[in-house]
Protein backbone atom coordinates (compact mmCIF):
# COMPACT_ATOMS: atom_id res chain seq x y z
CA UNK A 1 0.00 0.00 0.00
CA UNK A 2 2.82 2.37 0.89
CA UNK A 3 4.59 1.46 -2.34
CA UNK A 4 1.43 2.24 -4.35
CA UNK A 5 0.98 5.64 -2.69
CA UNK A 6 4.67 6.42 -3.17
CA UNK A 7 4.54 5.56 -6.86
CA UNK A 8 1.39 7.67 -7.31
CA UNK A 9 3.06 10.67 -5.63
CA UNK A 10 6.18 10.17 -7.75
CA UNK A 11 4.09 9.98 -10.93
CA UNK A 12 2.20 13.11 -9.90
CA UNK A 13 5.48 14.99 -9.43
CA UNK A 14 6.67 13.90 -12.87
CA UNK A 15 3.39 15.11 -14.42
CA UNK A 16 3.72 18.44 -12.59
CA UNK A 17 7.28 18.96 -13.80
CA UNK A 18 6.45 17.93 -17.36
CA UNK A 19 3.34 20.12 -17.52
CA UNK A 20 5.29 23.23 -16.60
CA UNK A 21 7.16 23.05 -19.94
CA UNK A 22 4.36 21.69 -22.14
CA UNK A 23 2.24 23.51 -24.70
CA UNK A 24 -1.20 24.41 -23.40
CA UNK A 25 -4.14 23.24 -25.52
CA UNK A 26 -7.76 24.35 -25.30
CA UNK A 27 -10.22 21.51 -25.82
CA UNK A 28 -13.93 22.11 -26.31
CA UNK A 29 -16.41 19.27 -25.91
CA UNK A 30 -19.80 20.92 -26.25
CA UNK A 31 -20.36 23.13 -23.21
CA UNK A 32 -17.20 21.80 -21.55
CA UNK A 33 -13.99 23.73 -22.25
CA UNK A 34 -10.67 22.67 -20.79
CA UNK A 35 -7.21 24.17 -20.99
CA UNK A 36 -4.55 21.57 -20.23
CA UNK A 37 -1.09 20.51 -21.38
CA UNK A 38 -1.05 18.69 -24.71
CA UNK A 39 0.14 15.33 -23.34
CA UNK A 40 -2.58 15.38 -20.67
CA UNK A 41 -5.26 15.78 -23.34
CA UNK A 42 -3.72 12.94 -25.35
CA UNK A 43 -3.61 10.71 -22.27
CA UNK A 44 -7.22 11.44 -21.35
CA UNK A 45 -8.48 10.67 -24.86
CA UNK A 46 -6.41 7.46 -25.00
CA UNK A 47 -7.73 6.15 -21.69
CA UNK A 48 -11.31 7.14 -22.54
CA UNK A 49 -11.07 5.22 -25.81
CA UNK A 50 -9.52 2.27 -23.99
CA UNK A 51 -12.31 2.28 -21.39
CA UNK A 52 -15.01 2.51 -24.08
CA UNK A 53 -13.44 -0.47 -25.87
CA UNK A 54 -13.37 -2.56 -22.70
CA UNK A 55 -16.99 -1.70 -21.86
CA UNK A 56 -18.17 -2.58 -25.37
CA UNK A 57 -16.36 -5.93 -25.34
CA UNK A 58 -17.80 -6.78 -21.92
CA UNK A 59 -21.29 -5.81 -23.10
CA UNK A 60 -20.93 -8.11 -26.14
CA UNK A 61 -19.77 -10.99 -23.94
CA UNK A 62 -22.67 -10.51 -21.51
CA UNK A 63 -25.27 -10.44 -24.31
CA UNK A 64 -23.79 -13.60 -25.87
CA UNK A 65 -23.94 -15.41 -22.53
CA UNK A 66 -27.60 -14.51 -22.10
CA UNK A 67 -28.47 -15.79 -25.59
CA UNK A 68 -26.68 -19.14 -25.23
CA UNK A 69 -28.40 -21.98 -23.48
CA UNK A 70 -26.16 -23.79 -21.03
CA UNK A 71 -24.77 -27.10 -22.27
CA UNK A 72 -25.73 -29.06 -19.15
CA UNK A 73 -29.44 -28.43 -19.66
CA UNK A 74 -29.46 -30.43 -22.89
CA UNK A 75 -30.69 -33.96 -22.16
CA UNK A 76 -30.47 -36.65 -24.83
CA UNK A 77 -33.00 -39.47 -24.35
CA UNK A 78 -32.44 -42.85 -26.01
Curated annotation (Swiss-Prot):
Q: What induces it?
A: Part of the probable 18 gene mamAB operon.
At the top level of its lineage, which domain of life is listed?
Answer: Bacteria
UniProt note: phenotype after gene disruption: Cells have no magnetic response and no magnetosome membranes. Deletion of genes mamH to mamV (amb0961 to amb0978) gives cells with no magnetosomes and no magnetic response.
Subcellular location(s): the record lists: Cell inner membrane; Magnetosome membrane
Residue ranges, Lumenal side: 23-38
Q: How does it sit in the membrane?
A: Single-pass membrane protein
Q: Spell out the coiled coil positions from the record.
A: none
**Hey, what's the signal peptide range on this chain?**
1-22
| Family annotation (NCBIfam families) | MamL
Q: Which family does it belong to?
A: Belongs to the magnetosome MamL family.
Q: Any remaining note in the record?
A: This bacteria makes up to 20 cubo-octahedral magnetosomes of about 45 nm in diameter which contain membrane-bound crystals of magnetite (Fe(3)O(4)). Expression of just the minimal mamAB gene cluster (amb0961 to amb0978), including this gene, is sufficient to form a minimal magnetosome chain with small magnetite particles.
Q: What is this protein called?
A: Magnetosome protein MamL
**Source organism of the structure:** Paramagnetospirillum magneticum (strain ATCC 700264 / AMB-1) (Magnetospirillum magneticum)
